[in-house]
Amino acid sequence: MEELLFTGGTGFLGKNIGPVLDKMYNVTTCGITPHDDIKANLAKDVPDLPHHYDVVLHACGKAHVVPKTEAEKQLFFDINYIGTIHLCNALEKVGTPKALVFISTVAVYGCEFGELITEEHSLDGDTPVSYTHLRAHETELHL
């Protein structure tokens, strides 16, 4: 069975798709909750991954809140961008996965609610959420 690393896997998304993934992969979760297999605060540290993963599902991040202070904007930057850099650094140490799936937000497209979005949609978000997710996307493209 293939190995899957799921960041943020004990959150909302993990609770909903985790049971399906468990049937298809040997899932290891990575995050800040006591229920995560690998305890790591990606915003602060490069996690020590025990081995190579075939697939990485990167779902941890900060969204759905409008930061009101510079400190809150910095938190978005640290979690969404720096956290992704730390994850990529850890993955390089154990071998690049054959697939990296990054769960992002429609904010990178400047959208606040439903419309059909494709890969051709322009990236023109102008919020701290969109900025940090766009930087994270760019980082992952270099992995």
Name what the model sees in each region:
Residues 133-143:
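Single conserved hydrophobic/aromatic residue that forms the stacking wall/gate
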Residues 45-79:
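NAD(P)H-binding glycine-rich loop region in Rossmannoid oxidoreductase-like domains
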Residues 77, 126-134:
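Short-chain dehydrogenase/reductase
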Residues 86-127:
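Conserved Rossmann-fold NAD(P)-dependent oxidoreductase catalytic core, especially the SDR/UDP-sugar
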Residues 7, 30, 59, 100-106:
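SDR active-site strand-loop-helix element
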Residues 4-20:
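N-terminal Rossmann NAD(P)H-binding glycine-rich loop of SDR-like oxidoreductase domains
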Residues 30-45:
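Adenosine-cofactor binding site in Rossmann-like domains, unifying the SAM/SAH pocket
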